[in-house]
Amino acid sequence: MKVFGNPNQKKQELKNLIKNLTLDERYLFKKKDFRKEILKNIDKNMTLLDVGKSMRDYFDEIVCVEKKTLDINIFENYPDFQFDLSEDIEIEKTELNEKFDVIIYLAVLEHVYNPFVAIKNLRKMLKNNGIIYGYVPFLYHYHAPEDLYFQDYYRFSKDGLAYLFREFHNLKLYPVRGRLSSSMHILFGSIWKRTFEKYNLNPILDGFFSKDKILNKQVGLTL
């Protein structure tokens, strides 16, 4: 048998990446609006970038020294920076280099055609000891619009996130839907959200059906 490279060493490195992340399974059974949770952790002295203006209605509630938006597309009232995160450019030569204390990207990364380059770019925009808050799907339906104004490329497992964010430290995952909630959301979509999720019934049901399977993830990371 011929061995090329050092596959055994790489296998161990990958295992260590996964073992070193934190998965807070208890979060699954605590129905919370994670946008509100993020809002509580933003200090008025921070600089902040919201990719895709993904804080939605909470964006206007953010109080900090400076808050900016970034998007590949142009909408009526944003972004401040039009930027293709998948484009490998020299961030170091732009005003975005190490500019932000906090970067938020919620339900954005699945729409980025090269998430590896995107995360590298976001890391360069982040100050030392800054934090990234994100939300990514694992089991979720295809949701690009018919006109493909934005596209839908990827889904992310725990192992995939560990590798994607391998240059960060203090990687923490918080599941927001379990086995039952994810299945029902795929099958019934907005009906499920307007009923069970609106009245916070899904954490109770997930408690019975989802303890061994964590599906959708919210992810918070610190550089």
Give, region by region, the residue ranges found by the protein language model:
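S-adenosyl-L-methionine-dependent methyltransferase catalytic module, highlighting the catalytic core
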Residues: 113-123, 131-223
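Class I SAM-dependent methyltransferase Rossmann-like catalytic core
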Residues: 1-43
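Alpha-helix initiation/capping motif
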Residues: 10-16, 43, 66, 178, ...
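Short linear motifs in intrinsically disordered/low-complexity regions
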Residues: 7-9, 25, 44-46, 72, ...
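Conserved SAM-binding loop
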Residues: 37-145, 150, 158-162
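A structural signal for well-ordered alpha-helical scaffolds and beta->alpha junctions
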Residues: 27-35, 48, 52-55, 154-158, ...
